[in-house]
């Protein structure tokens, strides 16, 4: 009988204390963010450089772009040009006015083999890779109008 009375009392205490429980905010709020990516992550560096028109001769270097590809064991590292940066088999930097173009060649500086296919520049061999991609003037372009020009390359992998 005592045991039954104790159990009943405990149930009442739990029911009464549960009915009055509540959350009162009294601090800061934290946020957890997660970005889920492909296993093969290809990071493309930024390059900002100034050149005079007279320096835009055929094969003149515009500059190096760093590329770091990790987790690409069974994939071919690739860089894709924005649609505004590729036409008829050629890469180019586009002016801020979206009219003027500065044609360029893209090639690795380590003599590894790469291929261009419809605006995608990809490594012929599979596997992670880190190195420098050189951007070079394609043809004599000393008459290029002054202004700001941009080439946007997105890192990824090539899938046949």
UniProtKB/Swiss-Prot annotation:
GO CC, alphabetical: pilus
Top-level taxon of origin: Bacteria
Region (Receptor-binding) location: 22-75
Signal peptide: 1-21
Pfam family, one: Dr_adhesin
Keyword Signal on entry: yes
SUPFAM superfamilies (UniProt xref): Bacterial adhesins (SSF49401)
Keyword Signal: yes
Keyword annotations of the record: Fimbrium, Signal
Main localization of the protein described in the UniProt heading: other
Protein location: Fimbrium
Family of the protein in this entry: Belongs to the Dr-adhesin family.
Function: Hemagglutinins of uropathogenic E.coli mediate adherence to the upper urinary tract. These adhesins bind to the Dr blood group antigen and also agglutinate human erythrocytes in the presence of D-mannose (mannose-resistant hemagglutination (MRHA)).
Protein name: Dr hemagglutinin structural subunit
Gene (name only): draA
């Amino acid at each position: 009988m005592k045991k039954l009375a104790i159990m009943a009392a405990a149930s009442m205490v739990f029911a009464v204390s549960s009915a009055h429980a509540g959350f009162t905010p009294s601090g800061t709020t934290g946020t957890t963010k997660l970005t889920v990516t492909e296993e093969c992550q290809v990071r493309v560096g930024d390059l900002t450089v100034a050149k005079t028109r007279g320096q835009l001769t055929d094969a003149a270097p515009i500059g190096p772009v760093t590329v770091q590809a990790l987790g690409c064991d069974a994939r071919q590292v690739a860089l894709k040009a924005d649609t505004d940066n590729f036409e008829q088999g050629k890469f180019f930097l586009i002016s801020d006015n979206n009219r003027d173009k500065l044609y360029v060649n893209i090639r690795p500086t380590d003599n590894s083999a790469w291929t261009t296919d419809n605006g995608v520049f990809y490594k012929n061999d599979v596997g992670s890779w880190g190195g420098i991609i050189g951007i070079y003037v394609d043809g004599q372009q000393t008459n290029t109008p002054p202004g700001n020009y941009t080439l946007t390359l997105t890192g990824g992998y090539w899938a046949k």
